[in-house]
Amino acid sequence: MAGVCDRVPNFLSPSEDQALGPALGSAVALNCTAWVFSRPQCPQPSVQWLKDGLALGNGSHFSLHQDFWVSDNFSEIVSSVLVFNLTKAEDYGTFTCSAWNVSSHSFTLWRAGPAGHVAAVLASLLVLVVLLLVALLYVKCRLNVLLWYQDTYGEVEMNDGKLYDAYVSYSDRPEDRKFVNFILKPQLERRRGYKLFLEDRDLLPRAEPSADLLVNLSRCRRLIVVLSDAFLRRPWCSQSFREGLCRLLELTRRPIFITFEGQRREPIHPALRLLRQHRHLVTLLLWKPGSVTPSSDFWKELQLALPRKVQYRPVEGDPQTRLQDDKDPMLIVRGRAAQGRAMESELDPDPEGDLGVRGPVFGEPPTPLHESKVSIGEGHASEMDVSDLGSRNYSARTDFYCLVSEDDV
């Protein structure tokens, strides 16, 4: 019977040796459960704990809880739980549980180092780099993206009865005239295709100042005010600028004010302070020494504040010259002879203009037919050079045309 009682237990937990790395100061519970073969004549099964080869028992530092469950077929399950706190480095080691001193499994506790924050630090740095790149792209490409959106999906302000894109108001000082005529106007009109109304150029004759201002503003889609030092020295800028600003907001849509970098010094002009307080109602732009570059942010912000420009593709050919085989009817010489009349009917199928082809007149002899075509150089010599007619652009002349006679030549 002794051989029956010496059968090797089967460990259910742990199924194999384990290595654990709990942190210092944590509580540890090691569970050792085994299935043993038992007979009435066999001794009571038990589980023994050892630490680094030394036996452990219940004490102030270690606590043991042992349970038994009897099953069929003369088998029994025994479980022992070792509970303790890792308070010092000596508490780490190899803990072995054995059943009947026949079979054993072990728990190896090793001290885990400080929590690894490398992955968290790398992830944080990656997120920070991504945010910096997004912020950099926003700063560098924000205006370009807004311009693309305006040119693609922006509101087209056409057929509104306006003749100009912007009304430019500035003082009559020489430096302001130079800024408007040599910097602002060339950049907006020539490079970007806007049409400006300058205060000293297209004024209505013999008009009252107040009525003239109302008429001019009604003809323009935007208002640009060059707030130079000379402009700010005007009496109304210091005394009644608030009333004037309220009036402008009623007359025009979101006026544009151009300020200069030298005006940022203290004390700030009351008009500039008022404009900064109402940024949500006006467009306030700052001119810097580097703004003269065509690709600077100043021009992009100004273009965003101005109406969207629509580019039209030029029409190829003039409807009035398509019937003439792309020949300019203004250069066709009309003759007086019969041959000239025949030449006229051949070169111009519509000699009476837009009224249609003239039919035969009652009583008029029919026009003789000629076997050979008469060229211009045979009957009536012309000194005009018509070799470049095919390369001319007729898109600008779409309203009317006239025929040039030989006498006019």
UniProtKB/Swiss-Prot annotation:
Entry's Gene Ontology cellular component terms: cell surface; membrane; plasma membrane
Membrane topology, record value: Single-pass type III membrane protein
Main localisation: membrane
Entry-linked InterPro entries: Ig-like_dom, Ig-like_dom_sf, Ig-like_fold, IL-1_rcpt_fam, TIR_dom, Toll_tir_struct_dom_sf
Keywords: Disulfide bond, Glycoprotein, Immunoglobulin domain, Membrane, Phosphoprotein, Signal-anchor, Transmembrane, Transmembrane helix
Protein's UniProt keywords contain Transmembrane helix: yes
TIR domain residues: 162-306
SUPFAM superfamilies: Immunoglobulin, Toll/Interleukin receptor TIR domain
Chain ranges on the Cytoplasmic side, renumbered to this chain: 140-409
GO biological-process terms attached to the record: acute-phase response; cell surface receptor signaling pathway; negative regulation of chemokine production; negative regulation of cytokine-mediated signaling pathway; negative regulation of interleukin-1-mediated signaling pathway; negative regulation of Toll signaling pathway
Primary role: Acts as a negative regulator of the Toll-like and IL-1R receptor signaling pathways. Attenuates the recruitment of receptor-proximal signaling components to the TLR4 receptor, probably through an TIR-TIR domain interaction with TLR4. Through its extracellular domain interferes with the heterodimerization of Il1R1 and IL1RAP.
Similarity comment: family membership: Belongs to the interleukin-1 receptor family.
Entry protein name: Single Ig IL-1-related receptor
Gene: Sigirr
